[in-house]
Amino acid sequence: MTEEKSTNKKNSLFEWVKAIIIAVVLALLIRAFLFEPYLVEGTSMDPTLHDGERLFVYKTVRYVGEFKRGDIVIIDGDEKNVHYVKRLIGLPGDTVQMKDDTLYINGKKVSEPYLSENRKEAEAVGVKLTGDFGPVKVPEGKYFVMGDNRQRSMDSRNGLGLIDKKRVAGTSQFVFFPFNEIRKTD
């Protein structure tokens, strides 16, 4: 009977170890291919996203599907553990231009409702929200991104340049922290 108890304890321990290993492997696979939490650092996406907020990034679009204009994307930086959160403005093949505080894609005026709060603040002090630039032709395999806080964002206009598709980690769908600020991101 003692041998039987010893065997049962070994089997029980083996089952626990096996369950823990499976859980760790599943967690790593989910984080690598499905979604991952990211920290928003800085004010370049204000007022849409705020410094210190945490969001989930869906990585599946990187492997299956296409990024869409207006998506909030996470970009892997050149350095390890450096990421940028920006809005995807120009797709491969697009021509992007900003003129008189109005965005044009392929010569057509594009509405940017997510900028309304920042635009009001800029108009109140008599400045443009976004300086004129372009036209910029986005090559195949690249994206043009900008932060929603146009006056304080390093993006495709001024430092990040055009973004390779392989550097886009995924899209943000919602903020999960702080808990009193849980919401979808648009």
From Swiss-Prot:
One Pfam family named in its UniProt record: Peptidase_S26
A GO CC term assigned to this protein in UniProt: plasma membrane
Enzyme class: hydrolase
Subcellular location: Cell membrane
Keywords: Cell membrane, Hydrolase, Membrane, Protease, Transmembrane, Transmembrane helix
EC number: 3.4.21.89
Membrane-protein topology: Single-pass type II membrane protein
Predominant cellular place of this UniProt entry's protein: membrane
GO biological process, one term: signal peptide processing
Active site: 44, 86
Residue spans crossing the bilayer: 20-40
Catalytic activity as recorded in UniProt: Cleavage of hydrophobic, N-terminal signal or leader sequences from secreted and periplasmic proteins
Highest taxon in the source lineage: Bacteria
Gene3D superfamilies from the UniProt entry: Umud Fragment, subunit A
Residue intervals annotated with topology Cytoplasmic: 1-19
PANTHER family: CHLOROPLAST PROCESSING PEPTIDASE (PTHR43390:SF1), SIGNAL PEPTIDASE I (PTHR43390)
Name the record gives this protein: Signal peptidase I
